[in-house]
Amino acid sequence: MANVIWRGPVHLAQPDSRTLKTGASILPGLAVTVTAGVFQLAATSKVDYFIMHNRAYIGETVDTAVPSGETGEAFKPVPQYEFNVRFAAATYAPGAVLSIASGQLKAAVTGEVAVAVFDEAASRAISANGLGDVRILANSYVVPA
């Protein structure tokens, strides 16, 4: 299901979402936050974040960015739900703990806030802004030394 952002089964309710204008061109699957009433890329995972959704209702795919100044929709992450998100370039192993940097999920390091885990069956190299599955953690935490 690489063509969707929320990867839940049909028997679960779709996560709550927020609809706002974007302050920049934003690809679906990137982590965003609300700043001055518009969606902006989440700089870190130390913020209240959302996951940008594709505008399927007008026929756009996960590869179509929401242009700056246009209305976009973003999901509020739900613990244990799976999302298809954008990653920083690296190789990720199943269960790898992830944080946010510039809207992308990346391997969390000491002192960062962990928000999700890599939830694919095997390790995989992902290019910058490539999509991959994550499971949202029930409780975020600061990665210890």
Name each model feature, range by range:
Residues 1-145:
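Surface-exposed, low-hydrophobicity beta-strand/loop segments enriched in small/polar/acidic residues
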